[in-house]
């Protein structure tokens, strides 16, 4: 069973929502809202690749997906429904523009035009900054386009305002950005 254009995936840990946190051996529900995009599961396991796909992603790899992939919605009559990505038996279609990174069993790799930047702590200054240095970070996961421009993973970079789209990957806060959101190498 393969789709002509989409990956077929299952929710990582078989849960559509990532709204339970363990604290001191006790599970706490952090959100009961199905509309809360921050509580939706962002990780998927690849069940099948698209027909004639020849890229680096294989069955069993993990994908970092858009928050709408696994979400439930209410239809016009208030009935709970799965979103457009739902296929069947807890399987979902993920199109090429619905995932941002993949884990090949060794490391995370940015997909297509996406890159990931790790924010850095605020530098000492007479100007108050909230915890992170504004518009500055370390390129954590680059892409081929950035590499061709000479921007390498580990470079301290500056990025456009309002381009920060936060994800938590392996316990680390990262901003998902597009290649053209990177403004300079510092």
Residue ranges of predicted features:
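Acidic-enriched and Gly/Ser
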Residues: 1-186
